[in-house]
């Protein structure tokens, strides 16, 4: 075996090792990736029930109510992006800053009936905060254009959404 051939085999072996390591790393990370989806995306293309996602949008005014499922108190509310709404069921104490008309991100799974069961609910932390994913989705769907000022406040945004949903 010549020196050139030996060097070529060493390079090929190194590339194979690096490629294998990269493939194993990506495979390990892919099972931990949690995708962000807006309600309109969930309605149009529901993920499989075993897939955990982050659902983001605004809590519709008047949608928060407490129900009883199998003897357990559950918070039920609707999350909307202005185009569609998804009902969310969450067993647990809602964050102190959770309000109707405010942005929220819920971590959980979409059920076969189209509802969403959340294992965690995150609310905004002050009056100017909006999760980046929610702001990006509002911009993408045309609900908010930064050229025309800041994002709509919760009450006017929710009023716009209620008119669209009702009419």
UniProtKB/Swiss-Prot annotation:
Residues 29-167 are periplasmic. The keyword Membrane applies. Its main location: membrane. One of its GO terms (biological process) is cytochrome complex assembly. Coiled coil: none annotated. One of its GO terms (cellular component) is plasma membrane. Residues 1-7 are cytoplasmic. Keywords: Cell inner membrane, Cell membrane, Cytochrome c-type biogenesis, Heme, Iron, Membrane, Metal-binding, Signal-anchor, Transmembrane, Transmembrane helix. The keyword Secreted does not apply. It is a single-pass type II membrane protein. It is found in: Cell inner membrane. Heme binds at residues 125, 129. PANTHER family: CYTOCHROME C-TYPE BIOGENESIS PROTEIN CCME HOMOLOG, MITOCHONDRIAL. Belongs to the CcmE/CycJ family. Heme chaperone required for the biogenesis of c-type cytochromes. Transiently binds heme delivered by CcmC and transfers the heme to apo-cytochromes in a process facilitated by CcmF and CcmH. This is Cytochrome c-type biogenesis protein CcmE. It comes from Gluconobacter oxydans (strain 621H) (Gluconobacter suboxydans).
């Amino acid at each position: 075996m010549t020196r050139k051939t030996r060097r070529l085999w060493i390079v090929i072996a190194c590339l194979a090792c690096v490629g294998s390591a990269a493939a194993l790393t990506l495979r390990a990370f892919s099972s931990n990736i949690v995708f962000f989806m807006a309600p309109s995306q969930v309605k149009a293309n529901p993920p499989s029930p075993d897939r955990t996602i982050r659902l983001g949008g605004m809590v519709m005014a008047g949608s928060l109510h407490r129900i009883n499922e199998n003897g357990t108190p559950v918070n039920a509310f609707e999350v909307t992006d202005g185009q569609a709404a998804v009902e969310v069921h969450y067993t647990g104490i809602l964050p102190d800053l959770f309000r109707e008309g405010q942005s929220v991100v819920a971590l959980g799974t979409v059920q076969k009936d189209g509802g969403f069961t959340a294992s965690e609910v995150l609310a905004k932390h002050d009056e100017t905060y909006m999760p980046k994913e929610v702001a990006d989705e509002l911009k993408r769907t045309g609900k908010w254009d930064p050229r025309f000022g800041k994002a709509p406040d919760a009450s006017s945004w929710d009023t716009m959404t209620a008119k669209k949903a009702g009419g």
